[in-house]
């Protein structure tokens, strides 16, 4: 059975970032999205290496996707057809697109967000029964109730 771990890093241009915290950020503070962008860039190679290492321990393929011609074409098409969709959301749709494409070659697929650092030697593919379908870690206990979301919070986390 063919197995793969994949991740991707799309360095969204600063001009396209969705500054969701602009109404609540303290004066002089770095917006969350910009800080995240900076930290991901600063730790880019370490974040790739830890995922490669995990895949190697499991004996599975690892594929890293980045801001390449395929993504540029995908984004261009998306912008043409859905101009109101933000770059951040296009990146999330691309994640699903990649999953679909990888499913043509691989039986079992693990997607890791770029900021995830595997901290176990246990095989995800042995621990989770993927024959039952998609595995999603549920964390709704950490979500804010809708009445606690304000125009200044803009998020459920």
Model-derived features: where do they sit?
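Conserved beta strand-loop-helix elements of the APE1-like EEP
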Residues: 156-157
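N-terminal anchoring/stem segment of glycosyltransferases
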Residues: 1-94, 104-105
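GT-A fold catalytic core of metal-dependent nucleotide-sugar glycosyltransferases
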Residues: 86-153
